[in-house]
């Protein structure tokens, strides 16, 4: 089992670099930095991380092919690969409609866009001249002036078609989920995609990009996870809620509370223990270890400790290192 950790660049880059270095010292294998227009730039942040770490792999978790042209993405991640001495990974997904609506960007044909972007980015990174007349991605002899070496590409994927595509074309897949029920479905879709193109499914790094909250006091861990879980519930398809026995109307209640900024209601009872169980790896080190082993048995090969990580970030990073990574 590999271990990654997610940081959101709402914090200054040097603060994230401190946490990234600490994560490296605690045995984490990957640091993933989110990419949203309202936060600090992902590639600027990754540059700072590259210069302040030695061995941990660093990547976008995840960018998309709408806000940045694939040639620009290829140039950016190739630069990170060069600066970091070959430690860069690219996390790329379809993005989300709400963000693109706010930016005035049309979210068209995400499956075709993602597939074609990955093909183009691989060719750019390999130093090839790219000519492509795809459904959504088009180039006419564009080429980078330098080669990056090998940069693994991980797809952010949730739905069955995206998961199947990840099995076909990606080195890994980042799945926003944390429960075995969700991964039983996801692993099958990835396997289907891999076998469709004659790949060994074990070549794909199946990653649980999870809401993670750890503390020796389980109540503190649960409270820290509630707001993140609320956003997950509010954005979950009905099918996923039904899979976990969560009433579909809870999505509207929680969505309304988020829209009103009524976080007291979320902390007070709208986010139930059932929701925490379904959408977070949460609790004591022993609780978290049990869930991780359950996921490993299904076929998950990397765990990413995503927001909030724990009620106290530095303490949580050390706890994961000493009580989980060191014992796996």
Curated annotation (Swiss-Prot):
It is an enzyme of class 1 (oxidoreductase). GO terms for molecular function: coenzyme F420-dependent N5,N10-methenyltetrahydromethanopterin reductase activity; oxidoreductase activity, acting on paired donors, with incorporation or reduction of molecular oxygen. Gene3D superfamilies: Luciferase-like domain. It comes from the Archaea. GO terms for biological process: methanogenesis, from carbon dioxide; one-carbon metabolic process. GO terms for cellular component: cytoplasm. Its EC number is 1.5.98.2. Keywords: Cytoplasm, Methanogenesis, One-carbon metabolism, Oxidoreductase. Its main location: cytoplasm. It catalyses: 5-methyl-5,6,7,8-tetrahydromethanopterin + oxidized coenzyme F420-(gamma-L-Glu)(n) + H(+) = 5,10-methylenetetrahydromethanopterin + reduced coenzyme F420-(gamma-L-Glu)(n). InterPro entries: F420-G6PD/mer, Luciferase-like_dom, Luciferase-like_sf, MeH4methanopterin_reductase. Pathway: One-carbon metabolism; methanogenesis from CO(2); methyl-coenzyme M from 5,10-methylene-5,6,7,8-tetrahydromethanopterin: step 1/2. Pfam families: Bac_luciferase (PF00296). It is found in: Cytoplasm. Belongs to the mer family. Catalyzes the reversible reduction of methylene-H(4)MPT to methyl-H(4)MPT. This is 5,10-methylenetetrahydromethanopterin reductase. It comes from Methanosarcina acetivorans (strain ATCC 35395 / DSM 2834 / JCM 12185 / C2A).
